[in-house]
Amino acid sequence: MISGVSTASLFMREMNEDALTVLGGLGVKSTEIFLTTLSEYSEDFARLLAARRGELLVNSVHLLNTQFEPQLFGSHPRAKKDAFDILRRAMASAQIFGAKNYTFHGITRLKKNSVPPDAGKLAANFSEISAACAEYGVTLCLENVHWALYNQPGLFRAIHAGCPNLRAVFDVKQARLSCYPYQMYIKDMEGCISHVHLSDVDENGKICL
């Protein structure tokens, strides 16, 4: 097992390119690069990150979900095309700085009356998204997130049945916030976990790590 630190841990303290230098200087061996804005999806910026990463292993890339990920599942052809254009640009960048995995949230589920997910339809969507990522040597990995698509155990396994290339990211904090036992998510993802997001809280519930 290799432990690492996400550039997101330095959000608003260091820009991504500088975060890599800081993490490397601290002796961190592996990282997830969290690209936070559309201008960071460019190949020029990716080359800057590649130059700054030093000996860091870039395990994965994480993108800001609300910028385009929900539209990858949309029915409007123009919006969906634009979303896939952004996806491919981001994956081309990931290929340049060496990320092999894409931590993915997908659809947001912010409304309490959200329609229950259709696993069969979602599997077709995920197959299309996964194929686009694979063009750049990147594996699509669905993360459990309490306010996004995968917010309860059972959904990953149902989607994976129709999209066998899909992998999973287990997030400890998000499992806690979903109010489901974390063991249920681990069981749901069994055999498919790509990487794990760890965090810790103090006695007041404040994130420490």
Annotate each predicted stretch with a short phrase.
Residues 8-16, 34-45, 71, 110-114, ...:
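Acidic-and-aromatic substrate-binding clefts and catalytic sites of carbohydrate-active enzymes
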